[in-house]
Swiss-Prot record:
Protein name: Late histone H2A.2.2
Record-listed N-acetylserine modification sites: 2
Species assigned in the record: Psammechinus miliaris
Chain residue ranges for the region called Disordered: 1-22
Superkingdom classification of source: Eukaryota
Keyword annotations of the record: Acetylation, Chromosome, DNA-binding, Isopeptide bond, Methylation, Nucleosome core, Nucleus, Phosphoprotein, Ubl conjugation
PROSITE patterns: HISTONE_H2A (PS00046)
Description of post-translational modifications: Monoubiquitination of Lys-119 gives a specific tag for epigenetic transcriptional repression.
InterPro entries, sorted: Histone-fold (IPR009072), Histone_H2A (IPR002119), Histone_H2A/H2B/H3 (IPR007125), Histone_H2A_C (IPR032454), Histone_H2A_CS (IPR032458)
Amino acid sequence: MSGRGKGAKSKSKAKSRSSRAGLQFPVGRVHRFLRKGNYANRVGAGAPVYLAAVLEYLTAEILELAGNAARDNKKSRIIPRHLQLAVRNDEELNKLLGGVTIAQGGVLPNIQAVLLPKKK
């Protein structure tokens, strides 16, 4: 009678930490990078989840704006130029990625006011 528990518990299917957190970005991989990167001696359980969520949010934000830029240019595929336009036209993203060069991104069209023809 003793020591046999309440019956056999069937082992449930493995569920990734990403799906538990409702994320698309890989929490396990982020955790591995945090451990291997020598950022700290120990890494808490919540840190990779939080970082993966932040990375996913930033990626979604940039892709949303780049998709809008592609649609404005009547294109169905996002190219580096659309990423550049999206980042540089958004004040906060431009500040965050100020020192970043996007390959094949080009520059923002900008003509100084003094160079424009004078209106009569």
